[in-house]
Amino acid sequence: MERVRIFDTTLRDGEQSPGVSLNAMEKLQIARQLQKLGVDVIEAGFPITSPGDKEAVSLIAREVKGVVVAALARASALDIETAWDAIKDAESPRIHTFIATSDIHLKYKLKMDRETVVERAVAAVKLAKKFTADVEFSAEDASRSDLDFLCRVVEAAVKAGATTINIPDTVGYAEPEEFGEFICKILEKVPVMDRAVLSVHCHDDLGLAVANSLAAIKNGARQVECTINGIGERAGNCSLEEIVMALYTRKDVLPFYTGIKTEEIYRTSKLVSNLTGMPVQPNKAIVGKNAFSHESGIHQDGVLKERTTYEIMNPRLVGIPESRLVLGKHSGRHALKERLLELGYELTEEQLNEAFVKFKALADKKKEVTDQDLEAMMEEEIRKVPETYTLDYFHISTGSTIIPTATVGLIKEGEKLEDAATGDGPVDAIYKAINKITGLTPVLEQYSINAVTSGEDALGEVVVKLKNGLGKIVTGRGVSTDILEASAKAYLNGINKLLFDYQAKGEKQ
């Protein structure tokens, strides 16, 4: 069997999803988990776009080992030099440079003729090659490009030194049979392709990104660019978990393998969902909460008799745990440690002590603590940034005949701070009181409530998106059995993220 390389672009293309904004530490957390997952390449970002993105790419390049770290750059000297400056400390650095090749892009975006595009592509690859031996070249909008011209550009890029050639379906226009044939023709028409790996990057505008990627693999592509949960521009990208599990499950027709540790898929999906603020749809293949659920009586009967009647893969294969322990207020540290280990959380003694305190507080409010409760508890810790403010208490006065009023107490560097405010509702009143204490007035872009568990004592999760005066958007989360407390914690989590960014960059509100 031949190996297919997995190029993860969650931190670059995935972060281009509307409303997603990750800080450097959040990107580093995801990059570390991607390395643990076993991806071959992490595209850490597009350094020229902002100082913050360059800083995040540099951080990942320095800290994450055992994986290729790539930076994106347009076919321009400044982009390529900036990309190299960001990844120069990586153990295995890659410069990924690109230029569009379709006539529509040449005419309306680049305003270049074909000769100039070929020259720019060659110059970009040659410059990148001066910095690193690992250079990837992408022909943007390749699937809508004239095949003969595309092959000319590809051949020129390989001769200039590109070691990977990427063929993007940038706008998700391709159809699987057509795209597979397209890949086959490129390999036939470009005699020097034996010097480079052929890669594909498919978007999901028609819901065909995974199908197109599989068709490309069947026809000679040996690298697939994808994202966790399929996030990305517009309708998203090829989903890493779907392409990997398709290759794993259907070896009879897809005789290929990847280096992915499949048992890390679920945890990686949860981490990306939580840090980006993009919930996974319940019916999402592989990682959705309904992916291994059976409601039909006939299906339930079949699964109870023999799992393979209605399941083509075991949920444990992708890291979805099967609960064997029921935890409650009488459960001890050892039981908690064992269950967290089964869920994929390896804790130090100090971390276990902190987790146990939170667990006991949660167990006092609930009869049984489920896996979902534990995951929510741990993910709240994962999302933490250094806390300028912590929630001490809040009091609410509200009713059908009175104006909602909130009194909020926060702690900053050991000092207790308190203020009160009225609002259009109890949540609005809490947020206005927090604003008065902190002196910040971010715009609340989004507020949503999700049930983490079911039942009367269910945990509720509140997700907020806050935007500061500079246009920076952060995601805040809070979890509690009390939805007002969850709302306060989510807003404060967002406030602390904004303050963390200000301090890191020396900015002012």
From Swiss-Prot:
Sites where the protein binds Mn(2+): D13, H201, H203, N237
Pfam families reported in the protein's UniProt record: HCS_D2 (PF22617), HMGL-like (PF00682), LeuA_dimer (PF08502)
Principal place of residence: cytoplasm
Keywords associated with the record: Amino-acid biosynthesis, Branched-chain amino acid biosynthesis, Cytoplasm, Leucine biosynthesis, Manganese, Metal-binding, Transferase
Domain of life: Bacteria
SUPFAM superfamilies xref list: 2-isopropylmalate synthase LeuA, allosteric (dimerisation) domain (SSF110921), Aldolase (SSF51569)
UniProt-recorded Gene Ontology molecular function terms: 2-isopropylmalate synthase activity; acetyl-CoA C-acetyltransferase activity; manganese ion binding
Localization annotation: Cytoplasm
Pyruvate carboxyltransferase domain location: 4-266
InterPro entries attached to this UniProt entry: 2-IPM_HCS-like (IPR050073), 2-isopropylmalate_synth_dimer (IPR013709), AIPM/Hcit_synth_CS (IPR002034), Aldolase_TIM (IPR013785), LeuA/HCS_post-cat (IPR054691), LeuA_allosteric_dom_sf (IPR036230), LeuA_bact_synth (IPR005671), PYR_CT (IPR000891)
Known cofactor(s): Mn(2+)
EC number in record: 2.3.3.13
GO terms, biological process: L-leucine biosynthetic process
Purpose of the protein: Catalyzes the condensation of the acetyl group of acetyl-CoA with 3-methyl-2-oxobutanoate (2-ketoisovalerate) to form 3-carboxy-3-hydroxy-4-methylpentanoate (2-isopropylmalate).
UniProt xrefs under NCBIfam families: leuA_bact, PRK00915.1-2, PRK00915.1-3, PRK00915.1-4, PRK00915.1-5
Family, similarity comment: Belongs to the alpha-IPM synthase/homocitrate synthase family. LeuA type 1 subfamily.
Protein name as annotated: 2-isopropylmalate synthase
